[in-house]
Amino acid sequence: MLKVKNFLGSRLKSFPTRKGKSDKECCRSLTSKLSVNEEYKEAFRTNSYLETRTKAEDQLGITSCSKLSSSSPSPSSSSDLSFHSHFTDYLLDPPQETLDALMQDSSLDNLIVTFFDLSSEACDVCETLLQCLQQIKINHNKIKRVMKIGKRVCNGAKTLECSPEMLCALIFQELSRFAALKNPLCRIVNEAQFRIVHDANSDLLTKLTSKKRRIRRKIRFFKFCKKLGGYSLVITHSAIVITLLIIALHSILGVFAAPALLGLCSFCLLRKKKAKGRMHKSNKDTTLEKLGTQIDIAAKGMFILINDLDTLSRLAGRLCDEIEHRKTVAAMCAKSRKIEVLKEALREFNGHEEKFSDQLQELEEHLYLCFHTINRSRRLVLAQITGQSS
């Protein structure tokens, strides 16, 4: 969590330099960008992140195998629903069943309950995006096949099975099929799922921050009352001691009674002070302070999650535009059915292949990082709750 927070903090500070800045400031900006890149790489090397990614990829492999082994075709909506529910039960930590049982056993704050609900919804959006990435990889196989066959056509290679004309016809057919495919990311980007989740999380973050401040004010007020009570106790005992001394000194036995009364009052005052110290120690971790800790952890986790979702939204939009551009090129080439247009399209695909792969990989890495952030914050809040009840 600390590495992820440091990485996000550095990322928020790393904006492009404005015009007119000195060379020294530009060098500092470049150094800052390099350090951000190192922190970026370090965040993806942590064991917890690697465990989350391995767990998700293993489940994706199991799900893909089960889909391939399924003999009877089923509607896409039902298959997506089964994938979604099974994947949620497998990856979300702590699972929802554990939280439901905890909510029945103990009374949780409404904001904490909302935090768990919204983090689960954010995980749902990430799972939907993960499904889209898997479909993008499947669709991209058509472009890979087109580039492979097109390379042979452009080089003038001849085969016994197919003539160059048949290979071109096969390429145009593959491009036409690719252009007819739906862009998987359009469903997320156009329906503004990220924006809906972002607004809900931002609203919760505002409420968590406000409640955290109120709890801190209450804790300060209670501490002030304790100090005021302690001072009042000292003043009261001092007044009693002075009164007893005056009475004792005006009596016949004042000389003998004064030391005894003074010692007795001092002893009582000391015992009261020790009892007060023990009471202050036992009440240090009060229910209010523990609730404040839960609210604070939930607010920090929500802040990081909002930044992660914003990053995912930008990366998904960028990749969505790249896919739409490829579909446009494929549609133009399939419609023209000219070898010159085909060669230009192949140059376009080959020239942007590395860029496309980098964008896909970066989005996938941030997606698994978001999974890790969700589970990490949920575990930390749950640890505070169970520590309170135990």
Curated annotation (Swiss-Prot):
Keyword Hydrolase in the entry? The reply is no
* Topological category with respect to the lipid bilayer: Multi-pass membrane protein
Annotated keywords? Membrane, Transmembrane, Transmembrane helix
Q: Which InterPro entries does the record match to this protein?
A: DUF677
Does the entry feature the keyword Nucleotide-binding, yes or no?
Answer: no
Q: Which residues cross the membrane?
A: 228-248, 250-270
Gene Ontology, cellular component aspect: membrane
Q: Name one Pfam family in it.
A: DUF677
Q: Tell me where it resides.
A: Membrane
PANTHER family per the UniProt record, alphabetical: UPF0496 PROTEIN 2-RELATED (PTHR31113:SF20), UPF0496 PROTEIN 3-RELATED (PTHR31113)
Q: Which family does it belong to?
A: Belongs to the UPF0496 family.
Q: What is this protein called?
A: UPF0496 protein At1g20180
